[in-house]
Amino acid sequence: MSLLYEVRGLVRRYGRVTALDLPALGVDELRIHSGQGLTLVGYNGSGKSTLLRLLAFLEEPDEGRIIYHGGEDPRREVSLLLQEPYLLKTTVFENVVLGLKLRGRRDGLEDAYQAAMRQVGFD
């Protein structure tokens, strides 16, 4: 199995939430290989979702590095699907085309939106 991610000295903070200024997530070192199974276990608020958002490059770490070895642009190859469905508090259009925008697509969004609407019977 080839190395997919290297994580070193990763810290993510969401503002000062306690007098101790504890980070939401702290990872000294983590290596993830292609095809490897990985289970994240922890209490609510322990940083599991934060780590996934960082690995999907949806957020930036406050400290440390995430090195992705899978290809040139991880935002085109990595996605995150959460267990609970979530809609942004915006328009249906923006929710439907969000994935395309995150991957850098700017052209043809209206056509993609219309095709998606037809696919689910909203034509």
Predicted regions and their residues:
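Conserved Walker
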Residues: 49-50, 91
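Conserved ABC ATPase "signature" region
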Residues: 108-123
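Conserved catalytic motifs of ABC-family nucleotide-binding domains
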Residues: 85-98, 104
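Conserved ABC transporter NBD signature motif
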Residues: 64-76, 113
